[in-house]
Amino acid sequence: MTKPDGINILTDTASLIEINGEPLAGTTLKKITQLERHSRNFIARSPFCMLATSSNEGCDASPRGDAPGFVYCLDDTTLLIPERPGNRIADSMSNIINHSEIGLLFLIPGRDDTLRVNGHGYLTDHPPYLKLLAARAKTPKLAIMLDITELYFHCPKAFIRSGLWDTSRHMPADELPTLGRMILEQINGEPPSKELQDNIDKALDEDSRENLY
């Protein structure tokens, strides 16, 4: 990024607090260090979470999803997250090997509040743990084991502002190009032929249907 002349960049937390203000009374008290019944119930009903990891090159945020409860609460301070088949780039897993700090954001469709869980992640192929994460008779090859350092519920303001679950505000699916077309244009810098786009879209669709587990 090229910093434009005359743009003020905050470089210390004192400046941040001066503009943003102090945390609201009581908000820091909600941070706890282990699972209890409400966080367990939320995770058991969540079919989707975002996984944040980092490396020396930067940060990654990756979606994770399956049937509600796909993330397993092993005990009060440990979560197991299955590594389902993907594109095998394995950015998140590579990051975890080198930088164990990770964050999770759990969502439940229709609810505007979320659950944030932070801690240290480790990769494991321990068979008893993998069996706990089996789905559709398929056992994952790997799992992420999260050692929890803090967790807390996050307020619903972002979801209220965005109207994420309000179907009347959802855009038509064809308002954007297909995934295949967008990827090809990013790679080649120009629109693909219809034949190539159709072939890529078909391959992506088949992969999404046949290689979920």
Residues of each region from the PLM?
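Binding-site signature for planar aromatic cofactors or substrates
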Residues: 1-213
